[in-house]
């Protein structure tokens, strides 16, 4: 199993800040206590998982991975939205594995109120998020406890596998492949909201979709080690503050605010608007500006402009003197951040695929 960075747990341990009120000093004090205790809490979790699962077996939620522990952490479910694979495994008996399979197949799409840090079942939803992304052994949709239970029983009887942990414990598990176009199915789910925000901010919907795919693979539970939250991976303390300021609000969006799909897509798209009309204003070629916006969504507008010149105005002049293809090449080869270089490549490719689908 891939070992994920323990700091991905941080956002689950405390909420993001809110607007300034007469309670702000109390909040700041509580926040400080939370951060001081963070190393202890994450260390305890890591130690607990290492004790139960062995070394190099720590698995936590991230941008494109949903992970839920149950059964006192002896059973866990992992959805890789990038790879299109669902792995459910247990060190307990098969009853716990069967229960975990049913719950992962029928989980909802609302991340609010779901504590991925705790060991407990996620409620079964009447509108499962994975409907249309997974089919059962008969080729049918999995929409309720009957179909999920029947499929779970089939998996236990026909697809059960075992592996040995480094601590000597035996794990029983099943791997459920998602359908080939699972990403497109998730994208379709959020298309009405994307179109709404595209109209609101006069933004190309294919750009919004390309960023969403690259940021989270349309995982509504997405969270990163940098505390970026939700479908468009908005960081409350940076982009979030800018967005709230633009909207005439104080403070920054909360975790629950950004786990709301509509508010998250609104926040991400409004940040694109800020990049286009404020931070990167002055770039005249629309294609060059789009490349700069994509790169800036990942690394910040200042970092993008400094690739061309330390002075902002000079950087704008330099960009305007280049063809879009040259801007693209420079940002994908000379940006100091490898992540930013790859980010532009990925988003541009994803955006092209959504333009074709239209």
Curated annotation (Swiss-Prot):
Pfam families per record: Mltc_N, SLT
Lipid linkage positions (S-diacylglycerol cysteine): 16
Keywords linked to the UniProt accession: Cell outer membrane, Cell wall biogenesis/degradation, Lipoprotein, Lyase, Membrane, Palmitate, Signal
Domain of life of the organism encoding this protein: Bacteria
A Gene Ontology molecular function term of the record: peptidoglycan lytic transglycosylase activity
Main location: membrane
Known EC number: 4.2.2.n1
UniProt subcellular location: Cell outer membrane
CDD domains in the record: LT_MltC_MltE (cd16893)
Lipid attachment points (N-palmitoyl cysteine): 16
PROSITE patterns on file: PROKAR_LIPOPROTEIN, TRANSGLYCOSYLASE
Gene3D superfamilies reported in the protein's UniProt record: 1.10.530.10
One of the protein's GO biological processes: peptidoglycan metabolic process
Transmembrane among keywords: no
EC class: lyase
InterPro entries per record: Lysozyme-like_dom_sf, Murein_transglycosylaseC, Murein_transglycosylaseC_N, Transglyc_AS, Transglycosylase_SLT_dom_1
Secretion signal, residue range per the UniProt entry: 1-15
One GO cellular component, as annotated: cell outer membrane
Topology in membrane: Lipid-anchor
Family in the record: Belongs to the transglycosylase Slt family.
PANTHER family named in the record: MEMBRANE-BOUND LYTIC MUREIN TRANSGLYCOSYLASE C, SOLUBLE LYTIC MUREIN TRANSGLYCOSYLASE-RELATED
Functional note: Murein-degrading enzyme. May play a role in recycling of muropeptides during cell elongation and/or cell division.
Designated name of the protein: Membrane-bound lytic murein transglycosylase C
Organism whose genome encodes this protein: Pasteurella multocida (strain Pm70)
Lineage, top ranks: Bacteria, Pseudomonadati, Pseudomonadota, Gammaproteobacteria, Pasteurellales
């Amino acid at each position: 199993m891939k070992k994920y960075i323990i700091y991905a747990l941080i956002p689950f341990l405390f909420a993001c800040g809110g607007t300034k009120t007469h309670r702000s000093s109390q909040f700041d004090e509580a926040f400080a206590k939370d951060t001081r205790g963070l190393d202890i809490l994450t260390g305890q979790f890591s130690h607990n998982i290492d004790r139960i699962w062995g070394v190099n077996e720590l698995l936590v939620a991230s941008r494109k991975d949903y992970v839920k522990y149950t059964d006192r952490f002896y059973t866990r479910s992992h959805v890789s939205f990038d790879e299109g694979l669902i792995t459910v495994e247990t060190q307990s008996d098969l009853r716990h594995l069967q229960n975990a399979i049913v719950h992962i197949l029928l989980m909802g799409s609302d991340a609010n109120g779901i504590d991925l840090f705790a060991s407990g079942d996620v409620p079964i939803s009447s509108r499962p998020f994975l409907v249309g992304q997974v089919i059962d052994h008969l080729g049918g949709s999995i929409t309720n406890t009957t179909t999920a239970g029947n499929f779970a029983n089939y998996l236990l009887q026909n697809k059960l596998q075992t592996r040995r942990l480094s601590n000597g414990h035996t794990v029983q598990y099943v791997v459920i492949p998602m359908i080939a176009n699972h990403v497109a199915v998730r994208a379709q789910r959020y298309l009405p909201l994307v179109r709404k925000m595209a109209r609101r901010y006069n933004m190309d919907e294919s750009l919004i979709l390309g960023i969403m795919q690259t940021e989270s693979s349309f995982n509504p539970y997405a969270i990163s080690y940098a505390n970026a939250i939700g479908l468009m991976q908005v960081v409350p303390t940076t982009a979030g503050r800018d967005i709230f300021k633009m909207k005439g609000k104080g403070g920054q969006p909360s975790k629950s605010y950004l786990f709301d799909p509509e508010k998250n897509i609104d926040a991400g798209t409004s940040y694109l608007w800020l990049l286009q009309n404020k931070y990167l204003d002055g770039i005249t070629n629309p294609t060059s500006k789009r490349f700069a916006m994509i790169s800036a969504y990942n690394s910040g507008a200042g970092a993008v402009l400094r690739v061309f010149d330390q002075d902002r105005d000079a950087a704008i002049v330099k960009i305007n003197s280049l063809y879009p293809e040259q801007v693209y090449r420079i940002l994908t080869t000379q940006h100091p951040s490898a992540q930013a270089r790859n980010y532009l490549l990925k988003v541009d490719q994803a955006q092209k695929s959504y333009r074709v689908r239209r």
